[in-house]
Amino acid sequence: MRFPILVLGALLTAPVTAQDIGAPDPLFRDNAVLDVTITGPLTTLVRERPKDDYVDGVLAYTDADGNGVELDLEIRARGHFRHANCDIPPVLLNLKRKQTPGTLFENQNKLKLVVQCDRSNRLEQAVLKEYLAYRILNAVTDKSFRVRLLSVTYINTEKQNDSEPRYAFLIEHKNRLAERFGLEDLEIEKTSVKSLDGAQLNLTSIFNFLVGNTDFSPVAGRPDDECCHNYVLFGKNETPQWAVPYDFDQSGFVDAPYAEANPR
């Protein structure tokens, strides 16, 4: 496995800077690659791609003291485009709250795991570049989703396999981001530009421009979806709404082989 550009190494070791208000959870305070093992019926997960039904699994890692930690979890497929078009779908990890206190995964429940679309080197690079896109945004605004890069060994309980570690990354849950800033996740149909915090909107719009991303809307969702397309809205009372972007796999910066620019 190799990194796409040298700057990623610096970002991996740089500490996350944050004030007491807005400090990320333990999982996202460290940028070192976390080695984990995920065990479960992976054949079912990949072939059937259940979005409504979970399969049981186990996540294991070694903590800072050298102790092995195992956490029971449920796993299901998720996503839209990548769910339909990738050999391996992105997944949602559902941890058991009673097992996480005192572990690196304290305060975590449901976590999005971004995996390689297929096993090619090019798609491995795409995962790393998308992770890097999140980290770049973290560097310019605390109001962004934190991420943690993993080296994952997958153990399939339905088939004997020799699995080499593969890169993936976890994304902070929107409820945890909201709690960091005393805001609420707004589940609304649509919004307007004038309702959004102007500085945050300008910053994230410039960011999307710089990474060559056209797959987003901060004011509306897809047909039949709540607001917004690849943005999450946060707010409280009469304060301006904060629009926070995610999903950068369609950007020119990531350069995934399946990416297509929005013709509009």
Give the role of each language-model region.
Residues 18-264:
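Phosphate/dinucleotide-binding and metal-coordinating scaffold of catalytic cores
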Residues 2-7:
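Sec-dependent signal peptide recognition
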